[in-house]
């Protein structure tokens, strides 16, 4: 397994409210965490870094070695972090703080993930890009209800309004999923600064190109910037080899 992480402020923003990192626990199991923060001043920066770092530090201290244990851990620790960031957000300086969250652990040939917000996790297998997560957003709710066409959703003025975030008052309802991995698969975690700028087919073409993994993440970010770079752009790309998929 090989991992490449990259974050970029983009072309229009003055600060980067995204955060990404990866961690290994005492059983040697890898977790990748990506967050896209929101809130005035530095609240978004703090929320995203805090969520990633708190969860990462907690993961490093575990001996978790099974998919079922990971799912229980996700359910427990994501709500703890939600309440922690919500409490901090009561301070006037951090009013409105919150963050999306993508958390993915790899146990042998399985990936298990938790999803909150409108960042995304995708699987690139062969010549196909599969979006594994469904955005927790107002526009996606309208789309699923048949009140918007995909074209209308793409250009909707309220596209950035999310229906769930880490830091909300109510208990979060994360989406969980697992994927059986095959040799040659790629997993991509990204903030919406990537997927709002480039298509799934462009992502697939870059990820399956014959260049080193770090060059693939750089190319993804460069394409998003060339398309306008309207937001911070963050990617975590994981390449699975034969030993991982056995």
Curated annotation (Swiss-Prot):
PROSITE patterns: PPM_2
Cofactor: record remark: Binds 2 manganese ions per subunit. Other divalent cations, such as Mg(2+) or Ca(2+), cannot serve as cofactors.
E.C. number: 3.1.3.16
InterPro entries in the cross-refs: PP2C (IPR015655), PPM-type-like_dom_sf (IPR036457), PPM-type_phosphatase-like_dom (IPR001932)
Annotated binding of Mn(2+) 1, by residue: 36-37
Record comment: activity regulation: Phosphatase activity is inhibited by NaF but not by okadaic acid.
Oligomer status and interactors: Interacts with the kinase domain of StkP.
Protein's job: Protein phosphatase able to dephosphorylate StkP-P and a phosphothreonine residue in a phosphopeptide synthetic substrate. PhpP and its cognate protein kinase StkP appear to constitute a functional signaling couple in vivo, PhpP's primary role probably being to control phosphorylation levels of StkP and of its targets (which include LocZ, DivIVA and KhpB (also called EloR/Jag)). PhpP thus performs an essential control of StkP activity. Overexpression confers an stkP deletion-like phenotype.
Stated name of the protein: Protein phosphatase PhpP
Native species: Streptococcus pneumoniae
